[in-house]
């Protein structure tokens, strides 16, 4: 915004704004994604793109992979002339190293992918500092799927097949795993539940990434299976090798689901709960009682979007990404992707951990007012020596 010294009744100052890196960022590697959400994952890539040096606290369950990837990053940094220390990787099994990193006064932000317990522990620690810093934590989700009768009538078998694959993909170790299916009570939903159960039991179970995830999965599955009013409609019972997760599908009424908050919690693995709602009003009530989620999906047709508009609105209010006639497990890396959501899916629903917008987590805006042109950052100088796209007087230019 260029200055207007002759403006009446008051002169307008020359004000120019750009983004600057926050400073050193600590990234905690995810246990379920040794590559895409770990040492060289989206947090690291976006922080480096923002101009921030990165310290990775490697996950102990894949420290060897972390070391290999770290070596590649350091070689790339040297090859491209990046400053020494722009990236480092630390290994430890305990929590002390991570705690000290978050508390260090030169660290300015934290990226985390993992459990609600772990994310909130870091969030609390960061806010207890003399200078609190942001913690961008992605902490999981049950990713509700609303299936309307029309979807079952038109393509019930197709959706059962697709969701059997989605629920079991990667042994269910996706944070976008569809762990909750909501439908309206009736023969159609019963038929869908039966077909989904049959399809999921046809698939060969696969190994989970490490014993800790496997143990937590079985603990959560067994806990929910024993809750009041819950029926286990699919349970893989054949013999498997160590750490192989047996898929399971549960079914429960809408009333029982509403009355039991335990059923709203994530079970991380090849697992999903089908909720039989007495009508669309109860379905909407359930959505309004859910915590924040990464994704929500609608299976139906365009007429359903109008007929059940309030249901769709309730779902949208709870999620960072809402899908129509798809499965949520794929996350495209692009500028329009939102991988985040209202708490506790993430600590700040305004940001994403996937896509180019993830960079915005690691920067802060600075305005320069009435600054001499030659002393401005090149990105703000009149001549635009960098040739970048800029917003000038409300219009994009380059």
Positions of predicted regions on the chain:
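Structural signal for hydrophobic packing residues in well-ordered secondary-structure cores
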Residues: 1, 70-77, 81, 105, ...
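Structural signal for terminal/edge beta-strands and the immediately following C-terminal loop/tail
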Residues: 365-398
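Extended low-complexity, polyampholyte segments enriched in Ser/Thr/Pro and acidic residues
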Residues: 173-175
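Short, surface-exposed amphipathic charged segments that create phosphate/polyanion-binding patches used
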Residues: 101-106, 149-155, 221-222, 246-248, ...
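Short, glycine-/Ser/Thr-/acidic-enriched flexible segments
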Residues: 32, 61, 94-96, 107, ...
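Rossmann-like NAD(P) dinucleotide-binding subdomain of oxidoreductase/dehydrogenase enzymes
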Residues: 2-164, 182-189
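C-terminal core of ALDH-fold dehydrogenases
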Residues: 240-243, 280, 285-376
